[in-house]
Amino acid sequence: DGFMAPTHVINYEEDLLVSDRSSGQIIRVNKQGAQEVIVDGLDSPEGIAIKDNAIYIFEGNTGQIKKYLEGQISIIAEVMPGSPVQSELQPPSMVFNGLAVKDNYLYISGELERSLFRIEL
């Protein structure tokens, strides 16, 4: 196996979670390198963050912030989507929008609006 277009990686329990923009997946990678698709069917997932076993995902093409928990996915917010294509060499919407969790808030960087969004969890 392999990744098509990995965009973000974070620690998750003893493993890693990787967002793959091209496949539309969040993939769990264990210490031995084995991969397991955790979330599928996303539209250009870029940023990922974890809080209380929930996985928060930023979709670059839609600007949606999604929450994945126990097999269920829901939209919790929408911000400006990622950057438009600037040239044939740049993939669609690919100036990264980062996610971070601090206390009971999710922070999202938005490059088109030059903003830092804060969402209460």
Predicted regions and their residues:
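Beta-rich, blade/repeat-based domains predominating
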Residues: 1-15, 21-22, 41-53, 60, ...
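Structural signal for beta-propeller blades
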Residues: 24-26, 63-66, 114-117
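Short loop/turn segments that connect beta-strands within beta-propeller blades
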Residues: 29-34, 68-72, 120-121
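Short C-terminal beta-strands that terminate individual repeats in beta-propeller domains
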Residues: 37-39, 76
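Extracytoplasmic/periplasmic copper-protein system
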Residues: 78-80
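Blade-level signature of beta-propeller repeat domains, shared across WD40, Kelch, NHL, RCC1
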Residues: 93-121
